[in-house]
Amino acid sequence: MGRGRIEIKKIENINSRQVTFSKRRNGLIKKAKELSILCDAEVALIIFSSTGKIYDFSSVCMEQILSRYGYTTASTEHKQQREHQLLICASHGNEAVLRNDDSMKGELERLQLAIERLKGKELEGMSFPDLISLENQLNESLHSVKDQKTQILLNQIERSRIQEKKALEENQILRKQVEMLGRGSGPKVLNERPQDSSPEADPESSSSEEDENDNEEHHSDTSLQLGLSSTGYCTKRKKPKIELVCDNSGSQVASD
């Protein structure tokens, strides 16, 4: 049969209590020693009996373990306190953020309502003075828009005038350059024209030369005809009269 489970509760019998304490104390010290050896751990054990007697065990110096325990505990407590403070600050910050968020939402709603009223909407809850103020605000906005529009148009007109003036100046400069080029290239063209001309390239000049040659030939022919006519006339006029004269010998001799 197995061992029955012992109910964990205070032992009322004093003698039985002392016997149980002695057995379990020795077993606890043995387990602590085995733990320090097997796991290379620093173990400290302090036991106070019900009669006030102290029992202790430490794998190393007890003061060193207690000092380390105190430092670690203090650090842990400080860390816990710091974390607690951070949590408090975070909660306060969250509350501030929430309040700021609420105020921002209210401001956003107010601005959206003002925009809608500027558009001529959501006017039901406005009083007469509020409507007059809104009307004045809209009139000022309208005047500002008109002034800005006029200024933009004036700026565009001024830019157009500047561009027109610049274009006229450039046109005048180009015209002067063209006139100067025309004056400088005129005589050069006249001088070079006879060198570049040829019968095939200049039909008008060739035709004029042919006309001049024809005129010269016609003039020479006319002169030749006139010369021949005058020569014949002169020959006709100066033709001597031949008379036959018989001399004593009986022969005929021609005489003028």
Swiss-Prot record:
Its main location: nucleus. CDD domains: MADS_MEF2_like. The gene is AGL18. The keyword Nucleus applies. InterPro entries: MADS-box/MEF2_TF, MEF2-like_N, TF_Kbox, TF_MADSbox, TF_MADSbox_sf. Residues 179-232 are annotated as: Disordered. Gene3D superfamilies: Transcription factor, MADS-box (3.40.1810.10). One of its GO terms (molecular function) is DNA-binding transcription factor activity. This is Agamous-like MADS-box protein AGL18. It is found in: Nucleus. Probable transcription factor involved in the negative regulation of flowering, probably through the photoperiodic pathway. Prevents premature flowering. Downstream regulator of a subset of the MIKC* MADS-controlled genes required during pollen maturation. Residues 222-232 have a biased composition (Polar residues). Residues 199-215 have a biased composition (Acidic residues). One of its GO terms (biological process) is pollen development. One of its GO terms (cellular component) is nucleus. Residues 94-184 form the K-box domain. Residues 1-61 form the MADS-box domain. PROSITE patterns: K_BOX (PS51297), MADS_BOX_1 (PS00350), MADS_BOX_2 (PS50066). The keyword DNA-binding applies. It comes from Arabidopsis thaliana (Mouse-ear cress). Mostly expressed in pollen, roots, flowers and siliques, and to a lower extent, in stems and leaves. Expressed in the endosperm and in developing male and female gametophytes. Also present in seedlings. Disruption phenotype: Altered expression of MIKC* MADS-controlled genes during pollen maturation. Early flowering under short-days conditions (SD) when combined with AGL15 disruption.
